[in-house]
Amino acid sequence: MALLPILEFPDPRLRTKAVPVDAAEVVSPAFQTLLDDMFQTMYEAPGIGLAASQVDVHKRFMVIDVSEEKDAPQVFINPEIVTRQGEQVYQEGCLSVPGIFADVSRADAITVRYLDRQGQPQELSTDGLLAVCIQHEMDHLDGKLFVDYLSPLKREMVRKKLAKLRKHVA
């Protein structure tokens, strides 16, 4: 397994809309290795979700593990939200926008259809943190970031703060 570089805002590649994964590709050794690498990258970061777009692979899949023990890895390939209910506000962060957190309003409960790691069709109804994480990662697949939900002024403040943080690291 290998750690993958995570793209950071405002990298324009984060705005690329991902294309569907071919069902035959899902079971290939290369794709399975990529999933393993994404999980390792997510856990090391540390994070609870990682979309392929964040590691410069512009295909519609993501890995998630919202468990405290980090022992419940989930793969969502070609995810599609089929129902949304209610509304909730969560403070979100993002591995592509390190050190920044903001309140984002999302559906409280969702039902999502997707292919699992073995390429089998699944449907999951969920709420709470997992629902938020799925919606957040799916935004990445559409070239959208959680900072897009902020006002232009706040978004510019985030961009400047990240630039300042990068200067201190360099």
Swiss-Prot record:
Cited Gene3D superfamilies: Peptide deformylase
Catalytic activity annotation: N-terminal N-formyl-L-methionyl-[peptide] + H2O = N-terminal L-methionyl-[peptide] + formate
Enzyme class, first EC level, given as a word: hydrolase
Organism superkingdom: Bacteria
A family per Pfam: Pep_deformylase
Positions of Fe cation binding: C94, H136, H140
Bound cofactor: record note: Binds 1 Fe(2+) ion.
SUPFAM superfamilies associated with the record: Peptide deformylase (SSF56420)
Record: active site: E137
A GO BP annotation: translation
Cofactor or coenzyme needed: Fe(2+)
Keyword Iron part of the UniProt annotation: yes
Keywords noted in UniProt: Hydrolase, Iron, Metal-binding, Protein biosynthesis
MF annotations from Gene Ontology: metal ion binding; peptide deformylase activity
Keyword rRNA processing among UniProt keywords: no
Enzyme Commission number: 3.5.1.88
Record HAMAP family: Pep_deformylase
Summary of the function given for this chain in its UniProt record: Removes the formyl group from the N-terminal Met of newly synthesized proteins. Requires at least a dipeptide for an efficient rate of reaction. N-terminal L-methionine is a prerequisite for activity but the enzyme has broad specificity at other positions.
PANTHER family on file: PEPTIDE DEFORMYLASE
Family of the protein in this entry: Belongs to the polypeptide deformylase family.
Name assigned to this protein: Peptide deformylase 2
Organism: Xanthomonas campestris pv. campestris (strain ATCC 33913 / DSM 3586 / NCPPB 528 / LMG 568 / P 25)
Gene (UniProt): def2
